[in-house]
């Protein structure tokens, strides 16, 4: 057993699972439960009263956090200590949204001035493009941005841009390309005019396979449409650490934006990786996004554990994963603009906490990162909500909704809100056999049929959920929401004693993919591989089954 599972608090939590009443009873016996199990921070409101938790549960979870030195680990991250131990790096995405007056040291150097310089450079670039001063090779202004990246350099900008659609500058559109499947970029290029398109290539090394391949394809398309090599600088910019490769490609050194080792890809939208966001919504709104995240940073760093929103959410998710064998967690967004968030949180959480050894290399003997999935309300209610209500697996849920809509048409938002709140009530309350039978009392069914149908209509309830509300979806509330989930992820990794900031599984996949590519290209013999891989490669070479 690991030190974590040997601890008295862990053992107490395990025993405590046997003594919890149904949530129906918890609400029936405590009129103040909603008031006592909800809090506001940074423009967000969290109702966590519909959880399998009592005051004793929470005290035990806070004790577990203290046993795991969570508060010290939070301070270590904000102080720029080397908490990504396998790569010997600080973890300072929080510095990207810090105030100019702050001083944050990484590798013996204050990094805030460089962050502020980059923001100023972004502002100048954004104003040049959005004002129409930036001209393409035929003298026309830019109308379309194509953001080329992969992983964090793709998903973050795409999801945030999608979420902030009401704030977009008129006359500018953005397209996101990540997948190396040629169909993805081909379909995008069909929509574009080479004279008015600007490509943003985001890759720390300027060599990420998918990103480089897509960028080379974009360049070939641009040249085929009439552009010259000397025109590339008017239509391509880069976010990269490899200035040499970018300039060799044809990008002007003045149009290369930096990336830093102390920012992981899945935490990078706050940096120049967010350039597509800034172009679409303007720098004032981009800074508001940063400010919302900064407010959540301040809350996370200073609020007591019992009043700390990321801590509470992280602990409750851990509670279900480690003590109720919950293998997944669903994120349900009741706002069309937020429909991309489940995929973003999926990458954030699963890439961070999909680990199986502790910091000192010991195999864990407890579950770590759950499968994060979800979708858009109310669509999911007519699909996978059925599994959450009546399936055998326990699936904790987060419901996210703004109180005010950007598009208040008729009764739409009232119906959306009623569905959101109704789902959380149904998950908590369920339906007993007696209630189901009573509903069938006036039907024409026989007594025997009523008994049978009632059994099928029973729902156990006691299904946990959090509800997150905001007044309205704005750049600031969105920034706070994303930072909330970043810190929630950190909380769990800190307690599990794993490194939430490396991704060796991703790296292995890259390496093996390159190896297979060489074999597909017949540069290497594939016969030494396992029979399955060799057989698949040979079928691909043949081009037919």
From Swiss-Prot:
GO molecular function per UniProt: carbohydrate derivative binding; glucose-6-phosphate isomerase activity; monosaccharide binding
Localisation per UniProt entry: Cytoplasm
SUPFAM superfamilies listed in its UniProt record: SIS domain
Biological processes, Gene Ontology terms: gluconeogenesis; glucose 6-phosphate metabolic process; glycolytic process
Pathway membership: Carbohydrate biosynthesis; gluconeogenesis; Carbohydrate degradation; glycolysis; D-glyceraldehyde 3-phosphate and glycerone phosphate from D-glucose: step 2/4
One GO cellular component term: cytosol
List of catalytic residues: 351 (proton donor), 382, 510
A Pfam entry, by short name: PGI
Reactions mediated catalytically: alpha-D-glucose 6-phosphate = beta-D-fructose 6-phosphate
Major enzyme class: isomerase
Main location: cytoplasm
InterPro entries from the UniProt entry: G6P_Isomerase (IPR001672), G6P_Isomerase_C (IPR023096), Phosphoglucose_isomerase_CS (IPR018189), SIS_dom_sf (IPR046348), SIS_PGI_1 (IPR035476), SIS_PGI_2 (IPR035482)
The enzyme's E.C. designation: 5.3.1.9
Entry keywords, A to Z: Cytoplasm, Gluconeogenesis, Glycolysis, Isomerase
NCBIfam families on file: PRK00179.1
Annotated function: Catalyzes the reversible isomerization of glucose-6-phosphate to fructose-6-phosphate.
PANTHER family reported for this sequence: GLUCOSE-6-PHOSPHATE ISOMERASE (PTHR11469:SF1)
Family per record: Belongs to the GPI family.
Name the UniProt record assigns to this protein: Glucose-6-phosphate isomerase
Species this chain originates from: Shewanella sp. (strain W3-18-1)
